[in-house]
Regions:
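Forkhead-associated
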Residues: 18-92
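Regulatory inter-domain linker segments that are low-complexity and enriched
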Residues: 1-7, 11, 20, 55-59, ...
Length: 115
């Protein structure tokens, strides 16, 4: 399961379960996630989850800026469209989020082959 976690001062304030498809973020009421912030455009960004053709129950994730006024940031860099990796920081206006994939094995213990 993909989770979008709202981060405040390094701690998780809330999380949203995501599913396949487009997830819009912006100030307007019609967005999947509405952010009440003057630095956020009406339709600011879209996170897209597409089922991976080779790995069952995993998704390819991308984030697209929708020509917002103040930009969409991933790991402090502005992006127009980018493939997203597990745990990267997304900043929209004053809001910070991280996407987590329960199926991702990033950061798990290293396994060594027998010698």
């Amino acid at each position: 399961m993909i989770k979008l976690k709202h981060i405040i001062n390094g701690a998780v304030a809330s999380e949203i379960d995501m599913s396949e498809g487009d997830f819009s973020i912006g100030r307007d009421h019609g967005n999947s996630l509405q952010l009440d912030d003057g630095a956020v455009s009406g339709k600011h960004a879209v996170i897209s989850l597409v089922a991976n053709a080779y790995l069952p129950e995993t998704f390819d994730i991308s984030i697209s800026d929708m020509d917002s006024t103040n930009g969409t940031y991933v790991n402090s860099f502005t992006v127009s469209q980018q493939h997203h990796k597990h745990g990267e920081v997304i900043r929209i206006g004053t809001y910070e989020y991280k996407l987590y994939d329960d199926q991702s094995h990033v950061g798990t213990q290293t396994e060594y082959l027998p010698q």
